[in-house]
Amino acid sequence: MNTNVFRLLLLGSLFSLSACVQQSEVRQMKHSVSTLNQEMTQLNKETVKITQQNRLNAKSSSGVYLLPGAKTPARLESQIGTLRMSLVNITPDTDGTTLTLRIQGESNDPLPAFSGTVEYGQIQGTIDNFQEINVQNQLINAPASVLAPSDVDIPLQLKGISVDQLGFVRIHDIQPVMP
């Protein structure tokens, strides 16, 4: 009789233990699905921004648009050659937004000293029918590069616009600066 009770207790314990193991696996699976859902949502947002950035640049006759949410560089044919531009280190600031404009030359020559114009603001409407609102601009200057291929990081402070409000940054009129 003692062995039967012992077996019954052992069987009950094993059954309870297997139920616990299954519950922890279910919890882990739910956590994994939740994490995957969040990552997919973020990827979808980035995909929309990349598509918008590409469409804006296809329509642009002057300069290149960079959308903060796209996290993707765009190419600009300029007087100093083909440049890849991207926005990095976008952070809130007490006066607005700070970010770094990364400019990369695509040739095997160092970049000359150059200047350009940066415009930034909000986009209202659809990509097919949009308006740039609250647009501000600032001039940028970059020294000549010594190495090739060249990368230039230009820190920018975008006053009067928060990270959430920043809809676009457009760079245009890149010109060599004569010494």
Named regions from a protein language model:
Residues 16, 22, 162-165:
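Short, solvent-exposed coil/turn linker segments
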Residues 20-88, 92-98:
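Membrane engagement elements in two modes
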Residues 73-179:
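Membrane-proximal structural modules of membrane-associated proteins and complexes
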